[in-house]
Amino acid sequence: MLLPKRTKYRKMMKGRNRGYATRGVDLALGEFGLKAVEAGRVNSRQIESARQAYTRHVKRQAKTWIRVFPDKPITKKPLETRMGKGKGGVEEWVMNIKPGRIIFEMSGVSEELAREALTLAMHKLPFKTKFVTKESENEVY
């Protein structure tokens, strides 16, 4: 499970997830990747589930990179608790994803195998994504 070792503050404000990604939008490490088409947030369990799905399919032949890291704490108050008494405890760690962000990268396998593997990972994520290559990464999403 991905989570920060330590943080300056335990809890964070909710914020808004608007606009398009400006960083992490190009394939930097691999030949193929998975790019977000819509906004959302992804937690460490979803990242791990997607990673396992594509790793099993390529049978560890490919070199892969995870380009996102959940560094935002999400809090939740216990069930049947009255309002007030402060903010709840940290429930999970997430990362806000904006359209255009590269989630996973892969190299060392054929395009066909990479497409199949990353399609399995797409189904594990809570927002729409698309398969990109070095040639197709600059297309409008």
From Swiss-Prot:
Q: Which GO terms describe its molecular function?
A: rRNA binding; structural constituent of ribosome; tRNA binding
Q: Which UniProt keywords apply?
A: Ribonucleoprotein, Ribosomal protein, RNA-binding, rRNA-binding, tRNA-binding
Lineage top rank: taxon? Bacteria
List the SUPFAM superfamilies hit by this protein, alphabetically: Ribosomal protein L16p/L10e (SSF54686)
InterPro entries recorded for this chain?
A: Ribosomal_uL16, Ribosomal_uL16_bact-type, Ribosomal_uL16_CS, Ribosomal_uL16_dom, Ribosomal_uL16_sf
Q: Which gene encodes it?
A: rplP
Question: Does RNA-binding count among this protein's keywords?
Answer: yes
Q: Which organism is the protein's source? A: Campylobacter fetus subsp. fetus (strain 82-40)
Protein name (Swiss-Prot/TrEMBL) = Large ribosomal subunit protein uL16
Quaternary organization: Part of the 50S ribosomal subunit.
Q: Which family does it belong to?
A: Belongs to the universal ribosomal protein uL16 family.
Q: What does this protein's UniProt record list under function?
A: Binds 23S rRNA and is also seen to make contacts with the A and possibly P site tRNAs.
Q: What GO cellular-component annotations does this UniProt entry give?
A: cytosolic large ribosomal subunit
UniProt xrefs under PANTHER family: 50S/60S RIBOSOMAL PROTEIN L16, LARGE RIBOSOMAL SUBUNIT PROTEIN UL16M
